[in-house]
Amino acid sequence: MSIIKEFKEFAVKGNVMDLAVGVIIGGAFSKIVDSVVKDLIMPVIGVLTGGLDFSNKFVLLGTIPPSFKGNPDSFKDLQAAGVAAFGYGSFITVAINFVILAFIIFLMVKFINKLRKPEEAAPAATPEDVVLLREIRDSLKQR
């Protein structure tokens, strides 16, 4: 079998195509969740915490060089200048993104599982002793 033929068989199998569709939809869906967190949830949390902006929460680990021209209270400016800073606010935002995304995926899987019809279990195999007893019975009937 040629490599191209093997690749075609591999690429068109149901699982590979399902995975490709899932990755594409997941990428688009993560942008929606990111926007929900950044544009809807974090501003509400900011209002509830007195205007706290999580994106600029950081701990300075190094010194700011004298040639630094940006805002020393801006995590992005410090990062761009190569100043060592621990950006825990950005991590909090990403963690909230993850929790929301995981919860939505959980709900989707739960919903899909409800829609699926439960597969009927195959009848249990007849025990060997019962089969043997039936054979003996049938043999006795024939005499």
UniProtKB/Swiss-Prot annotation:
GO terms for cellular component: plasma membrane. The chain crosses the membrane at residues 10-30, 89-109. It is a multi-pass membrane protein. One of its GO terms (molecular function) is mechanosensitive monoatomic ion channel activity. Keywords: Cell inner membrane, Cell membrane, Ion channel, Ion transport, Membrane, Transmembrane, Transmembrane helix, Transport. It is found in: Cell inner membrane. InterPro entries: Mechanosensitive_channel_CS, MS_channel, MSC/AndL, MscL_channel. Homopentamer. Channel that opens in response to stretch forces in the membrane lipid bilayer. May participate in the regulation of osmotic pressure changes within the cell. Belongs to the MscL family. NCBIfam families: mscL, PRK00567.1-4, PRK13952.1. This is Large-conductance mechanosensitive channel.
